[in-house]
Amino acid sequence: MGLRFTKALSRLFGKKEMRILMVGLDAAGKTTILYKLKLGEIVTTIPTIGFNVETVEYKNISFTVWDVGGQDKIRPLWRHYFQNTQGLIFVVDSNDRERVVEARDELHRMLNEDELRDAVLLVFANKQDLPNAMNAAEITDKLGLHSLRQRHWYIQSTCATSGEGLYEGLDWLSNNLANKT
């Protein structure tokens, strides 16, 4: 009886875990976001060949975040990270108008994968500090997010270097994880 009570309490009050896959085109700011969340500071980054993985503790949730490189040659490897992913963070460089269609195509290709059918989608419209950045509404339109009828999604304006918007995104993820468990 005591064990059952302890398990019930830990389910209610214990730390939840969430596996997050963070992807996007190269130079969108994925690694900067990861280490801003993990360390609270800006780190010097180089293009990610392969992946970085860190655990980010936030609001009683342990987010295991896999940051996977976004160069076109290694995007086919993204699918190797899909299994058991509960949340997908897709990072977009809001200032890169020339590649937003490419970003849309990669996002929709990924979302068609069966292994990601239950994953919630958080889009970080990053680099909002730049003067010509597209706002969240424009990114929503250009990525075709309204067409995702069977997918639970949210878009958050962010600036990885200042940290603006990052924790609001994690709030959305944590609330949606709580609703799914």
From Swiss-Prot:
Its EC number is 3.6.5.2. It is an enzyme of class 3 (hydrolase). Pfam families: Arf. A lipid is attached at G2 (N-myristoyl glycine). GO terms for molecular function: GTP binding; GTPase activity. It catalyses: GTP + H2O = GDP + phosphate + H(+). Keywords: ER-Golgi transport, Golgi apparatus, GTP-binding, Hydrolase, Lipoprotein, Myristate, Nucleotide-binding, Protein transport, Transport. One of its GO terms (biological process) is vesicle-mediated transport. GO terms for cellular component: Golgi apparatus. InterPro entries: Arf1-5-like, P-loop_NTPase, Small_GTP-bd, Small_GTPase_ARF, Small_GTPase_ARF/SAR. GTP binds at residues 24-31, 67-71, 126-129. It is found in: Golgi apparatus. It comes from the Eukaryota. Belongs to the small GTPase superfamily. Arf family. GTP-binding protein involved in protein trafficking; may modulate vesicle budding and uncoating within the Golgi apparatus. This is ADP-ribosylation factor 1.
